[in-house]
């Protein structure tokens, strides 16, 4: 039949594309990388002509592998503060795309949230200033909250007082569980957690969300995709193909927001890959916990670096991020080519058109 012929022709064309292999960080069980998991499991990487080898490596080990000529890793897709600290140490890193945005929460004990809220300013600044705070060091939700307070008239001196550990105004904890327990035991009044932990631990530790950090700064960047400038130059076509496949997987994920059968398929694929329970995966992907975004978002990176630097996260980094132009370490060309080509090849696709518009706005 004609359809079969078309399909055969399409398959032949697909087979003709071979842009080689990319070694990509897929940390075991980590579903923050759901878009990559989908692109792999649905065969989109292959269709676009790139072989993606999954490497169970994350954090500084991954950045070191990317930075070294003989390291067997091309791309890290989770985290961002560590990327900036590595750039400060002289690593040859460049951001080429995004994994997710937002994702932090301000929490308190059940029944206490209202006293920290304000209808006009989201947070009641006086209540926040007099509260005892708990968090894990480098927690993005605090970085964003801190910047929000500064942007709304809270002075540097007041922030310094809040962050003075010797006064007991702030306490740092080893992990997210310890932060949640500190709220439950009334060791702290307000705490900062990734949103998934705030929701996961709500019942077990009597927590409620005061505000999402994304309410304070919409679309603030978190997990970015980084490679090295050398690897990007060497494997540019493979990176473009990789980004095309990811954008297609992102579209499929978004369809799950309105189509139950797609949602179920997405959840099953990610649950099967990760070994996590389907209910947990469903909440994580579609329950308002995670906001995915494939765009590199240069504007958001610049804004986040300012906030992170103001909070002291980057002081030991080796360069002064107040004067350093982080755009030197952002290369949007692979993603830009991918979304431009997809939008051109699919002129009736409103999703691609909106991503292209977003790309043009956020990456001046």
Model feature map: region roles:
Residues 1-14, 145, 242:
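Gram-positive cell-envelope targeting signals
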Residues 234-320:
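Secondary-structure end/capping motifs
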Residues 172-272:
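Pocket-lining segment of extracytoplasmic ligand-binding domains
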Residues 11-175, 189-195, 209-213, 218-219, ...:
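Short, glycine-/small- and polar/acidic-enriched structural segments
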Residues 43, 48-49, 70, 77-80, ...:
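Sec/Tat-exported extracytoplasmic proteins
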Residues 306-364:
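Conserved C-terminal helix/tail region of periplasmic/extracytoplasmic solute-binding proteins
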Residues 53, 60-61, 161-168, 282-292, ...:
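Short linear loop/turn motifs
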């Amino acid at each position: 039949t004609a359809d079969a012929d078309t399909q055969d022709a399409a398959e032949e064309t697909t087979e003709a594309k071979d842009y080689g292999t990319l070694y990509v960080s897929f940390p075991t069980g980590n579903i923050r990388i759901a878009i990559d998991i989908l692109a792999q499991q649905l065969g989109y990487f292959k269709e676009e002509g790139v072989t993606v080898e999954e490497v169970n490596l994350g954090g500084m080990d991954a950045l070191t592998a990317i930075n070294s000529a003989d390291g067997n890793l091309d791309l890290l897709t989770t985290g961002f503060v560590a990327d900036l600290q590595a750039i400060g140490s002289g690593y040859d890193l460049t951001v080429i795309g995004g994994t997710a945005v937002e994702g932090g929460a301000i929490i308190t004990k059940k029944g206490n949230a209202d006293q920290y809220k304000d209808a006009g300013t989201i947070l009641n600044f006086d209540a926040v200033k007099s509260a005892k705070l708990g968090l894990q060091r480098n927690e993005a939700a605090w970085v964003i909250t801190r910047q929000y307070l500064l942007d709304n008239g809270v002075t540097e001196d007041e922030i310094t007082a809040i962050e003075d550990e010797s006064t007991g105004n702030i306490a740092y904890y080893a992990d997210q569980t310890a932060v949640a327990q500190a709220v439950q035991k009334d060791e702290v009044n307000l705490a900062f957690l990734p949103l998934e932990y705030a929701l996961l631990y709500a019942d077990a530790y009597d927590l409620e969300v005061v505000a999402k950090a994304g309410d304070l700064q919409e679309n603030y960047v978190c997990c970015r995709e980084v490679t090295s400038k050398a690897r990007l130059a060497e494997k540019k076509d493979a990176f473009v193909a990789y980004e095309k496949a990811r954008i297609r997987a992102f579209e499929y994920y978004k369809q799950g927001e309105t189509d139950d059968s797609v949602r179920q398929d997405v959840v099953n694929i990610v649950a099967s890959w990760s070994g996590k329970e389907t209910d947990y995966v469903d909440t994580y992907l579609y329950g308002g916990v995670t906001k995915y975004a494939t765009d590199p978002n240069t504007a958001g990176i610049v804004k986040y670096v300012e906030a992170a630097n103001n909070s002291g996260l980057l002081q030991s980094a080796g360069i002064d991020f107040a004067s350093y132009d982080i755009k030197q370490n952002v290369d949007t060309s692979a993603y830009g080519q991918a979304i431009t080509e997809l939008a051109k090849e699919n002129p009736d696709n409103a999703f691609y058109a909106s991503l292209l518009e977003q790309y043009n706005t956020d990456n001046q």
